[in-house]
Design a protein with these regions (language model features):
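Acidic, glycine/proline-rich low-complexity segments that act as flexible tails and inter-domain linkers
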Residues: 1-52, 105-122
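C-terminal structural segments of small proteins and small subunits
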Residues: 88-112
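Short, thiol/selenol-centered motifs that function as redox-active sites or metal-ligating centers
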Residues: 56, 60-72
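Polybasic, low-complexity binding patches
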Residues: 84-88, 121
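Alpha-helical scaffold segments that form or flank carboxylate-/histidine-based iron centers
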Residues: 53-61, 90-95
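Iron-sulfur (Fe-S) cluster-binding segments and ferredoxin-like electron-carrier domains
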Residues: 73-84, 113
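Amphipathic alpha-helical segments within well-ordered protein domains
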Residues: 39-40, 57, 74-78
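Residue-level detector of well-ordered alpha-helical segments, enriched
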Residues: 51-55, 69, 86
Length: 122
């Protein structure tokens, strides 16, 4: 997905992803349900907090250049109470690891997500 084609908004991208998951689940529920159970278990509170797990997931999303997951986990970080500074610091760690690709996503997509998601709380 190109940065300029964000379905007109970050929330639009999240909605598009949820629609896709719904369609996928309808077609092959046994795989979707197993995958969803696995990911839910991974993000439960444990030795790491849910908040720490979201920050890690955001960093991985940036390093792998996965824009849907970057948006999803930026929202997850906000939902878990992370500050902008904490989010950007985690992004900085990802940039140190992954280099320029992560930094370019941080200075554009993540900052846009922070602005839009915080201004459109449900």
């Amino acid at each position: 997905m190109e940065h300029e084609q964000h379905h007109s908004s970050v929330n639009g991208v999240l909605h598009h992803y949820k629609e896709g998951i719904g369609s996928f689940t309808n077609q092959i529920p046994e795989i979707a349900e197993t995958y969803n159970a696995f990911t839910q278990a991974c993000f439960q509170e444990g030795s790491l907090t849910k908040r720490e797990k979201q920050l890690i997931a955001l960093g991985i999303s940036l390093a792998t250049q996965d824009e849907y997951c970057t948006i999803y986990h930026t929202k997850g970080c906000l939902d878990q109470g992370c500050s902008d500074k904490e989010i950007l610091e985690a992004c900085g760690v990802s940039a140190a690891f992954a280099g320029g690709a992560a930094m370019s996503q941080t200075v554009t997509l993540v900052q846009e997500c922070l602005t839009e998601l915080k201004n459109h709380k449900h």
